Amino acid sequence: MFSRHRRGEPLRALALVLSFVLASATGALAQTRTSVLAGTVTAANQPVAGAAVTATGSNLTLRAQTDARGIFTIPGVPIGSYDVEIVAPQGHASLRVDVSGPGANLTVALSQLKEIGRTSVTSRPPAHGSGTDLTLNAEALTRSPAAGSLPNLLIQLPGAARGANGVVHINGDHGDINYIVDGAPIPQELNRIVGSEFDPNDIAFIEALQGAYPAQYGERFASVININTRNGSGPPGFIGDLNAGSYGSIDSTLGYHTNIGKGTLVAAFRNERGNRGLDPPNFDSPHNSFSNANQFLRFTLPTGPNFLNLTVSRSYQTYQIPNDVAGGQPANSDVNETQEDLFTSLQFRHPIGDHGSLSFGPSYKRSRIRDFGDPSNDFTFGEAGNPGAPTDCANALASSGPIVNGVVTNPVPNQNVNYGNTTCAFSLNGDRIAIDVGGNLDYVNHSAKHDLAFGGIYTATHVEKTYAVTLQPGNFLAPIFTPATPGAPFTVDDASPNIGHLVALYVQDTWKMGTGWQLDYGVRGDSFTVNSTQFSTGFGQLSPRAKLTRFFGARDSVYAYYGRFFTPFSLENVSPLAAYTLNLPLLTNVAQFDLKPQRDSVYEVGGHFALGRGDLGVRVMQKNATDLIDDTQVGVTNLHQDINFNQGRIATQTAYYQVGLARAGRFYAALTHTYAVNKGCETQLLAPCFGVGNDWTPADHDQRIDFTSGLIANDRRGGWFGIDGEYGSGLSSALNPGSITCGGADGSLGGPCKRTPHLTFDAEKGFALHGGMALTLRVRNIFNDRYYVTFANAQGNHYAPPRMFDVGLRLNTK
């Protein structure tokens, strides 16, 4: 029995039928992103028939032959960079092409002289995405100053705002980024506030989708980061790098690729450590060491025209949580967190002639996060942050009834105590494990007028958790549960597992209505259930989406888009009984499990316009959200869980310019204005809403203005120079020292205000050495802007990194 939203039952029944069909795959949610590589081959201005076309990339070698019109088509091509070789009696050609979701269409003139280089394909703007979609190839990823850091790479995307400890907020959303790796999404069921879901050193190609999402995409909508991982071609060989720099940082990577039978194997290992892993609450960075160990394997096996791809990634990260000495935390506090992630996917692709493909396969993820508290010092720190009297935690209840089946009855709050989330000190020891399995099936068929796609996905999640939240000595629970020691600390344990199931079906079509118009339309159905020992509930939604595009030649277009989105809440949360027990002074009954999925209506217009040799993309979006999802903190601990606001509004306007430079270089610039507000906190599970105003309030991740720009210039000797710049107007703050821009219609009313405006630059120079090696010199935050990433914010106080240097040596940069 489900507690609400029973109107989703018909959809759920249909989706469960599909889940049985897919059960034999026993894998995880997947959304295969493949494209079409096509082109026309000529010689002496005449079409060339029978030319042999070979495309090598993504661990694959794909082949085709031109027809009588000189045209070739390779369907079902994974996104990535490809070396294309064309051979015919009339001549040959060799070029390198980046293939993104919209595909690539080449026009190649054969020559008797072989010319090798990278082509910058000029084709109509991406028709399936938004005005600010972009791709990052291997050169952009490895030669950017942000290389090696996923947050630093993401912050260069249009509409990105820097949050604390590696969190990145894109397009006004809290952080709901959808990562898809080699066709399979990475589940994100644990509430992770530090660290990254995937190691950036294992990425060879990124397609970043920013909006106008077709029906195949679901769950998270700040941005879709479609990743093609490490791949190899040619003779077996090594690749690697070694970097050392500020704060004792050491970062080393060693990779190797080889052929095994008809297949290609790529393996890589990364080890990283240093003394500044997170953004500390104080100007300096005490107790802030970190480490990261990552192992990666990819094996791709062609079987005739088909291929099978296996991807395995494992990481183990450790973090010391920085101490807030200025806020009263003892300098010798030793709070730590570890994160362990194993992700594997197996994808099978079958081309259907030259006009379609079928993809399916399983994936699996196991994530474990452990928190290790320091009770004595945690209590000292928490007591220092209590705004009331030292005895308020002990005196928070005037009386209570007997304990019945573990439930404290009839709690009566003490009216003389102004109890809040910081009245008591907490210490957390936590161990949470999420296991995700499921299956997928995706089909696409291309014709002259239509590109039809449909598919189904299923995932099952089991979250096992053990929370031990200990209240300070002198608390309101010990006299009730342990009356013999009324002044002792008391621990509230929560070991209730959560089990969730998500099923989705989608169908979408691209209708090419002549040369000037195109209609993309589709519908997606989502069904989501979650149950535990104390609750069971389920939800569903049908989400129509449509995008109409008008083309003005090959490089100019405008579009209008409407879509409905459905975002499930995280499957990690505090149980109702534990939430009630921790909040007895605020609750009179056991907390209800009242979390809801977020439901959005999205309106978007945009386009692409030729500007010189480059492309100017424009995107204007309005999102109206019901039951907007945010998160809240459990005391002063690293334990977070989702909450809902009754309404949310996000408006963003972005202009993004990009142009290719010589030798695969690039220049880009993005300017974004964002407005993100929410209203009416409605979640009582952790009592975060008592005393919170009900009017529109800027979200804690609301940054009104951001501007990013960057350049990668490659020289003739194989070296390069890269520079990135970022300006942000600052995130929301409850305080306003210095009269920094505040909220309100005119930007001058009282808080939440904005702290702190910042302008930073990072630069890297690569010097080519003999044998494909390179020496790298990098400076981050060149002008040493020591700004607050967050200040008096729901995310706490966090300082940005200072100026930092590193020097490195790379092996096999070609």
For each predicted feature, which ranges?
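Short, acidic, small-residue-rich periplasmic hinge/interaction motif at the N-terminus
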Residues: 40-46, 52-58, 87-90, 100-143, ...
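Extracytoplasmic beta-strand/coil segments of soluble accessory domains associated
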Residues: 149-186, 204
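Conserved C-terminal beta-signal and adjacent last beta-strands/turns
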Residues: 16, 301-304, 337, 698-814
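Gram-negative outer-membrane beta-barrel transporters
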Residues: 513-514, 620-626, 641-737, 783
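Transmembrane beta-barrel wall of Gram-negative outer-membrane proteins
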Residues: 244-273, 282-319, 336-357
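Short acidic/polar hinge/loop motifs at secondary-structure boundaries
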Residues: 184-210
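N-terminal periplasmic accessory domains that precede
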Residues: 105-108, 150-153, 168, 193-196, ...
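Membrane-embedded beta-barrel scaffold of Gram-negative outer-membrane proteins
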Residues: 359-363, 367-371, 551, 559, ...
